[in-house]
Amino acid sequence: SEIQPYLSLTNIRNAAFTTAERLFDIKFKEIEKFPKYHEDVEGYEVIDQEDNLIGIFLTDYYARPSKQGGAWMTSYRDQSKNDGVVLPIIINVCNFPKPIGLSPVLLNLEHAITLFHEFGHALHGLLSDVTYPSLSGTSVPRDYVEFPSQMMENWIRNPEVLFEFATHHETGERIPEELMSKYLASQKFNQGFATTEYIAASYLDLAWHTEKKEIEDVNLFEKKLFKEKGLPIEIDSRYQSTNFSHIFAGGYSASYYSYMWSE
């Protein structure tokens, strides 16, 4: 796409770090050497305004054959103070294309938004300040857990952030205002379609977890549900039951609506 040459992984990561630094008075200091499970993993000390270490942030951004698809945040160690001060260790895992030679990784729009989204989850874990680990970081009601991540997405759509960090990977030229305006407009295009997809998926999730009868035919179950809800035939659910991992093995059972609720 036209905007991709301006969205190098390095630039977008720096945009995320700088946004967090300005919002929360923290700093990210790269760790040169540390034990890691793969060479692609990078690590950062997260430091507050008084130079106190508040957590460790790890990134594993590149796709590889042995890695599960998708993107997520994982807490290797939750913050707590119940039995002494325990600092969080948080990782963001993505599947961006790995660089070839000296070429930079160029992200598409979806990848850039994903980086900010998962970084929001990471900040939720890193900035946690609770006594008990059971309440730490993302261990909150599902109604709220997507709020920090959805909020962070807004910053990659912010003109000031884009103009500062979206620079051409070869020339260093800042993104032209006309191109930036086209990108921002594209984020608002066809929102009725996208919203209906999300609503349909949320209904499907709730239907699976409230249906008392045994479901023998998944396709028939879906068609009947969407007909009852008045889903236009031109629009399908964001997910079908057979690939809707969020609600069966992803911790979002009867809670997929929380994405829209957080928005």
What are these regions (language model features)?
Residues S1-E263:
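Cation-handling catalytic/transport regions enriched in His/Asp/Glu
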